[in-house]
């Protein structure tokens, strides 16, 4: 199983960062590896979303079920995709009204060795760079 743990301190509120990460339908606008993204179902405290990976010749879709705690966290669990396991958590800790700590923790494993050999290196690059992509997007949207 692969584990990714990343965090960053940003000059934006926890609510702003939560809204950015929770806006799955906009992912293709700023994530370079995203071929498409869509929210399938959404309530105040949950969602189901699919993301298409299109990177370095790899084209795969994965779907997650997400528990939402607005302004605080998003817990992700795999519904479908090339993984035997995928769990993750985005957390947003308010430091003051204009700053927060954002954390991404991902645990994933692939459905078989062949899939892991093909997709593993690509998904690791994607997962490693994901937090940076959201921080960059926040700068574009929220910088004054």
Listing of model-derived features with the role each one plays in the protein:
Residues 14, 40-45, 68-71, 91-101:
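A short, structured loop/turn motif at beta-sheet edges
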Residues 78-128:
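Beta-strand/loop substructures that line and gate deep hydrophobic ligand-binding cavities in soluble
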Residues 6-8, 37-39, 62-67, 87-94:
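Hydrophobic/aromatic beta-strand elements that line small-molecule binding cavities or substrate pockets
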């Amino acid at each position: 199983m692969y584990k990714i743990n990343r965090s960053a301190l940003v000059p934006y509120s926890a609510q702003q960062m939560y809204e950015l990460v929770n806006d799955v339908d906009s992912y293709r606008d700023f994530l370079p590896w995203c071929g498409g993204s869509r929210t399938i179902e959404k309530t105040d405290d949950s969602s189901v979303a699919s993301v298409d990976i299109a990177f370095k010749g790899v084209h795969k879709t994965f779907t997650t079920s997400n528990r939402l705690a607005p302004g605080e966290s998003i817990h992700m669990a795999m519904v479908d995709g090339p993984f035997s396991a995928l769990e993750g958590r985005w957390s947003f800790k308010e430091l003051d009204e204009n700053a927060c700590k954002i954390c991404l923790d991902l645990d994933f494993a692939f459905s078989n060795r062949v899939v892991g050999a093909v997709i593993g290196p690509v998904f690791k690059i994607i997962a490693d760079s994901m937090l940076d992509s959201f921080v960059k997007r926040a700068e574009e949207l929220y910088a004054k």
